[in-house]
Regions:
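Metal-ion/cofactor- or nucleotide/acyl-coenzyme-handling active-site neighborhoods
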Residues: 2-196
Length: 196
């Protein structure tokens, strides 16, 4: 059996408890402060697909739109004035190779899995930490997490996580740019997602 030193054991128990009860923790409280903060507004979710151009980003910048960036989006910064309002990453490999770049992205908010903060020592300045549910054994489809202060279904893509966060923040019109083709998503009054 694995013998843990007592301090590590206490920390592990505490971390497990927080992840199970994140909505009661300071992390959940911080997330709840942004619930519906952008009610009825529109935003652009910028994925890093081959269709993404610096022209797309420049338009978002010139129109002063809210936008989400993800993963290695900082590689586009040389080509555009645009910077994401919000940044999301769930990939430990990207953190391991790009922590300084990620910390220097000038976003208003960065959304990072608390799991990676606790278990992989990923520290992002002023992050909004959420509980990522990576459980792939469940046979349910990707569920839309309306309450991201409880947990986020992170078995899909980081784009999906961005949509979840945008909906939680109250954005109604969500445009996806740089995915295989551009999508427009509307969140209706019941919180249901409609893809055009």
């Amino acid at each position: 059996s694995m013998i843990m030193n007592p301090l590590k054991s206490i920390v592990a128990r505490y971390q497990g408890y927080i992840l199970t009860n994140i909505q009661k923790s300071k992390y959940g409280k911080k997330l709840r402060k942004i619930k519906n903060a952008h009610k009825g507004e529109r935003c652009f979710i910028v994925a890093n697909g081959p269709s993404l151009t610096s022209d797309d980003l420049e338009k978002i910048y010139q129109n002063n739109e809210y936008s989400f960036g993800m993963n290695r989006i900082y590689k586009m910064f040389d080509e555009t004035n645009w910077r994401p309002s919000f940044y999301v990453c769930e990939d430990i490999n990207i953190f391991n190779e790009s922590i300084d770049e990620i910390n220097s992205i000038p976003s208003q908010m960065k959304f990072i899995p608390l799991n990676l903060h606790f278990y992989n020592n990923i520290n992002i300045d002023d992050a909004y930490y959420f509980k990522a549910n990576y459980d792939r054994n469940k046979d349910y489809p990707h569920s839309f997490s309306t309450e991201i202060d409880v947990q986020m279904d992170s078995r899909g893509t980081v784009t999906f996580t961005c949509i979840n966060i945008a909906a939680y923040m109250g954005f109604k019109d969500i445009y996806l740019v740089g995915v295989d083709h551009n999508y427009h998503i509307t969140i209706n009054e019941d919180g249901e997602t409609i893809v055009d």
